[in-house]
Amino acid sequence: MPSDFISLLSADLDLESPKSLYSRESVYDLLPKELQLPPPRETSVASMSQTSGGEAGSPPPAVVAADASSAPSSSSMGGACSSFTTSSSPTIYSTSVTDSKAMQVESCSSAVGVSNRGVSEKQLTGNTVQQHPSTPKRHTVLYISPPPEDLLDNSRMSCQDEGCGLESEQSCSMWMEDSPSNFSNMSTSSYNDNTEVPRKSRKRNPKQRPGVKRRDCEESNMDIFDADSAKAPHYVLSQLTTDNKGNSKAGNGTLDSQKGTGVKKSPMLCGQYPVKSEGKELKIVVQPETQHRARYLTEGSRGSVKDRTQQGFPTVKLEGHNEPVVLQVFVGNDSGRVKPHGFYQACRVTGRNTTPCKEVDIEGTTVIEVGLDPSNNMTLAVDCVGILKLRNADVEARIGIAGSKKKSTRARLVFRVNITRKDGSTLTLQTPSSPILCTQPAGVPEILKKSLHSCSVKGEEEVFLIGKNFLKGTKVIFQENVSDENSWKSEAEIDMELFHQNHLIVKVPPYHDQHITLPVSVGIYVVTNAGRSHDVQPFTYTPDPAAGALNVNVKKEISSPARPCSFEEAMKAMKTTGCNVDKVTILPNALITPLISSSMIKTEDVTPMEVTSEKRSSPIFQTTKSIGSTQQTLETISNIAGGAPFSSPSSSSHLTPESENQQQLQPKAYNPETLTTIQTQDISQPGTFPAVSAASQLPSSDALLQQATQFQTREAQSRDTIQSDTVVNLSQLTEASQQQQSPLQEQAQTLQQQIPSNIFPSPSSVSQLQSTIQQLQAGSFTGSAAGGRSGSVDLVQQVLEAQQQLSSVLFSTPDGNENVQEQLNADIFQVSQIQNSVSPGMFSSAESAVHTRPDNLLPGRADSVHQQTENTLSNQQQQQQQQQQVMESSAAMVMEMQQSICQAAAQIQSELFPSAASASGSLQQSPVYQQPSHMMSALPTNEDMQMQCELFSSPPAASGNETSTTTTPQVATPGSTMFQTPSSGDGEETGAQAKQIQNSVFQTMVQMQRSGDSQPQVNLFSSTKNIMSVQNNGTQQQGNSLFQQGSEMMSLQSGNFLQQSSHSQAQLFHPQNPIADAQNLSQETQGSIFHSPNPIVHSQTSTASSEQLQPSMFHSQNTIAVLQGSSVPQDQQSPNIFLSQSSINNLQTNTVAQEEQISFFAAQNSISPLQSTSNTEQQAAFQQQPPISHIQTPILSQEQAQPSQQGLFQPQVALGSLPPNPMPQNQQGPIFQTQRPIVGMQSNSPSQEQQQQQQQQQQQQQQQQQQQQSILFSNQNAMATMASQKQPPPNMMFSPNQNPMASQEQQNQSIFHQQSNMAPMNQEQQPMQFQNQPTVSSLQNPGPTQSESPQTSLFHSSPQIQLVQGSPSSQDQQVTLFLSPASMSALQTSINQPDMQQSPLYSPQNNIPGIQGSTSSPQPQATLFHNTTGGTINQIQNSPGSSQQTSGMFLFGIQNNCSQLLTSGPATLPDQLMAINQQGQPQNEGQSSVTTLLSQQMPETSPLASSVNSSQNMEKIDLLVSLQSQGNNLTGSF
């Protein structure tokens, strides 16, 4: 009895809570004071009488006797006690009505009962009797005494009477808290039993009342209830009454019988039983699922509880017993002692194939009984048990509010078997499952839209966020670099009054640096208990206008624009000043500021949008008023001009970028006033103007579409024009944003005026070209503004002529041009570095313009870009300060660059604009402008990204831009894609996803760049492509053909632009490629991406569409040489190839696909096919770039990556795998990884960003090299030759499967190098493939012969890059890439030889012929690594992985060899790699190694360029050094 009493007491422990809950605190007093039993007696009598229908008076004693006899614990309590207990507990469980009423009524009686039990059996008996009398009073619900469940508990039975009584009270409360299950049991029984609660009618009161449950609970009933429903002293009463009732009901028989059999059974629900006993064990073989939505009684069935795979069901096995037994299943509490759950019941699920079972009610708890049969090995999959949720109101009615306080939403399935021993006794085994969450999990929060995209650094503005699943406890976080936990983040203040699940209002927190000079992009995400939002929304902090003179400047600027009220006047002014750089700068600033304001106004006026150029300008001028608001203008500028990316990413990063991209592209074609001015300064126009125009265009997509349509025609013209004039236009566009940033504008104007004046005046041809371009642009822009397409056609012709002149300059001085370009590249590197320093500002505004154009353009343009980039002077000042600090040397170099650029300005500008600038620079720059904004938004998000962007953007404009964005935006498009991608990628940028996208985009970009600078070449297709065409065949002619072909290609790729421009780019791309649609992922984004030349990038991002698009782009690139002749067919082919490239996915799937790829390659038999295939692969890689995140991570584990790469890279890898060596397959897979991994590795190494940055640097360098090379090649017309030459090797490569690698590398590298490098890239890739594929050796030989100079450059830039890229994830595989260039033949000859040959390969990268000859792999490799851009990047990329890996990668393409190579790798290389790897280390170390690497790479670049003079190489090295010093930023970001 003491034990019973104790159990009752433990149930009573809740008595404390019942105390407060129950009207009678005296009950508690009564428990200890047995004397107080009489008052409870009445209560208990009432409860005994139990309305539930228990025969309180007589049945209880009988029950008591039965119970006492049946239940040892109850017997210990005393016969009466046991009966009381038993009855009460069953009552509690079985009759929740009784329980609640009885409990309430019984609160006294049960308390009495408890005390009685505590006192003695006699007292209990008396109590029972008393309770019977009290039954009449039973209606006194108030007297619910604490549930004696615990009293019933066996564990409590040993308590002393009074002490137990007290304990029981405490234990009750304890139990209730301890196990919701007891409480729930109570609640369940009360729920079922609760006749009191009218609602309960729906519950099966009779069922639950059956004594079965009561008997179970006899002793443990109270326990059961006490835990979850422990608080119901009424339980005790109700249990008592219920028992009587239940016993009287047949429950008695059941109870007795079950008590007999099941005293164990009755304790079953509340009692604690072992899992293993007497050699018998009840095991849960398969645990149930962790979350199962319970159903309400009024709902339909939600099915049975499944296992965690959702394919099966929880499975139970009984070991050590071979006779049929009954398995009982009920729902218990989620933790602690096993008790029935108060709020959840088991319910039977019937179905065609479910196990037959029966539903039994024990103590108010539903128990499912299923047979365990030896025929099934005593194993049973329980597929017939669901979970039923009881209504809280029913539970409360049953057990009282106190008992139902604890609402646990977790439950366990409890499995129990009763095994009858030979002596007739019963052995009970019980095992609970793991907890199951019975509610719907909270949804992950999402942000769908926000009202504000940018804000000053002061913050405090309100942002409305519309989204999903904003639950209580939501936090809105602003974080600078979402991927870096240590970056600045701040929690925004939420207006809780207007808090809602789907919307909330927050105040923007102030930015930590109140003195930024350039817009900074951060990410916004929401965190709730369910996790954080996956998509990170971009948000831009703009410099405080009050802090700087921006307002004054802006006002001044605005005032000047205010004077020209009409667009015509402005145009006239622009025209008059068009030739004058200074005037042009000023006018564009004035015009641009209005443009920006007009963009702001455009929101008001949709018509201006229609006539993008004219209306824009006129609205701009007309909207001098708008401009009048300096801050608005500045903000608009920062959003539009300074950060076209801002406006696109900030305002509507997804939609805006597309329109912006289109707008940007379109503005190029058609901003009459701005273009005139801008085209005078080519640089500004593509990026800035598009930004400005984008800003103005953003408001009306129709106008944008129209503009885009116009732009399609104009795009060819304007792009040609832009190619030659891009620098000036960009500068002016930059100035336009600068005007918006008045201080920056002034500085930019002065700088641009000075620089452009130096640049343009110094080269007479350039000045002539510029003047012609200005005239053409002025006329054509005016015409385009007024006449739209006809004007654009004229403009195209004019542009073509101007580009021809430029190209003539370029081609006339191939060596000089190359030198100039090398210098420009070096200068660009410096400028880029400077811009890198400025890159934050550049990122914020037309950073890419600075990066891209400045690379190609003069430092002055970089300055103007910086100014433009910085929406405010403060931004540029900061940039300048950064430049000065980080790049005083760079500044000096920039000055030198400016001088050298001025000297070589004519050549360089002509070269840069038409070829280098146009090809890599102008395309890249306009993308850069577009990108920069995004970069601004994205980079601010990731300072590392910024650093990377700076570094990368500085070396190659496109690469830099891509790098600066580092995010998909960068990759997606040098400029416009950046915008669009940034818009789409902004969020991505902001988030880890963004990083992956960035990685993938960047990879795509890198690959794009590598595959003929596909991004730039997308622009190249429009502008760079034309440039490349110019390089290959007369910039203008080829540009036209490219535009025509490229138009088609652009229709596939650049055509995207046309279509995109006519429609939103997404639309363009949708039409552009079914694949684009197939790439649903980034169709819109792709639209944006494609909208700019970056469609390819996006295509890369999305496999199907980007594959097709990329092929065309690649074709255009590849066909830049080849494609010129057959660009459309190749484009078509490349789409086919790309469709085949879907086959490439098959190729990715493996060799068959590889063969297909090869056949594709063979079918195309041109590098462009190769590139397209490779690009498609790359695209696939990029498309699978998210996979590349796989690959990236897999790249870390390349074999893993290889499967994914096989998906991604295997097209290429398959090509690689086609090679005889299986390891080469892996390596080639890695090579492909490296190629994509260049991207992939960038993204995939521990420091994927660093790798990407490194890769980007490499790519940028390569791009520069490519530009140089392309200039060289274009000057030499080697591109065409190369293309033709390359085509055969690609064919060879394709046929041998080597081409996949070669094509990939070519595509990656040649994209990087543009087409001139494409052949070398192919060859390089072929050599890399040669490792795997002996056939490559033949290709390799042609590759070296054809592209020894190109290949050298290619190799320096691209193969190493690929290897390097590979290195982060898997150096060995990446090694394959490196091997391919130089050691391909050697590798073909013997894999072991390649070790030494590899060093030659790498050294050939420095000097492909000579180094190839040299076999000391470690040293050459070290030098190669140091010297080759790829080497540097390799080191950098390897840095993520390991210097050994780097050496290994360099050392060998073959994995086995890789280990050897790794071991043999020169210490220098590892050291430098280590330094680069430790880019996290002091930037100085990374810098030094990077500097050495970059400088060495620059010389390599010159070998790569082969036309580049060593002096130029030295300049490049210096630039690289300065870049590396600036690159410290990159290094830091790495």
From Swiss-Prot:
CDD domains documented for this protein: IPT_NFAT (cd01178), RHD-n_TonEBP (cd07882)
Comp. bias (Low complexity): 63-89, 179-192, 876-885, 963-977, 1250-1269, 1320-1334
Cellular compartments annotated: Nucleus; Cytoplasm; Chromosome
Biased composition (Basic residues): 200-212
Positions where Phosphoserine occurs in the chain: S120, S134, S155, S560
Tissue: Detected in white and brown adipose tissue, muscle, heart, liver and kidney. Expressed in lymphocytes (at protein level).
PTM entry text: Phosphorylated at Thr-135 by CDK5 in response to osmotic stress; this phosphorylation mediates its rapid nuclear localization. Poly-ADP-ribosylated by PARP1 in response to DNA damage, promoting recruitment to sites of R-loop-associated DNA damage.
Protein name in UniProt: Nuclear factor of activated T-cells 5
Species for this entry: Mus musculus (Mouse)
Classification of source organism: Eukaryota, Metazoa, Chordata, Craniata, Vertebrata
Gene encoding the protein: Nfat5
